[in-house]
């Protein structure tokens, strides 16, 4: 669905992409929204969120060579937002049923892409 719409992109480390796809496959095979699945999914979503926040909010400041004071203020604000996000994610995932788990796994699979080959 995303490829049919305009969208923004945030790079993630290869290790995180590999872990995301492995986790999606593992949890899809198990098909149960039990504590183990929720813990793995929570950890993955938190890492994806943290990478996205860094890229969309801190990377532009790094590219602008923002000073230490501005970077510290930005990090403090983003950390507060991140803590709030973690609480919400945790509350939502605690209430997951098997069908909702499958929907979240579909979404994660939809947003994870391998790097494109360089143009020649």
PLM feature segments, named:
Residues 1-120:
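Protein-protein interaction and targeting regions used for scaffolding, dimerization, and localization
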């Amino acid at each position: 669905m995303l490829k049919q719409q305009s969208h923004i992109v945030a790079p993630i480390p290869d290790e995180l992409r590999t872990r995301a796809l492995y986790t999606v496959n593992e949890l899809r095979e198990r098909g149960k929204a039990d504590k183990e699945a929720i813990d793995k999914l929570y950890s993955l979503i938190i890492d994806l969120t943290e990478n996205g926040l860094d890229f969309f909010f801190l990377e532009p400041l790094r590219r602008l060579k923002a000073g230490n004071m501005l970077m510290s203020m930005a990090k403090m604000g983003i950390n507060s937002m991140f803590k709030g996000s973690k609480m919400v994610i945790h509350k939502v995932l605690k209430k997951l049923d098997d069908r909702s788990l499958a929907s979240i796994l579909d979404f994660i699979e939809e947003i994870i892409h391998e790097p494109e080959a360089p143009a020649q």
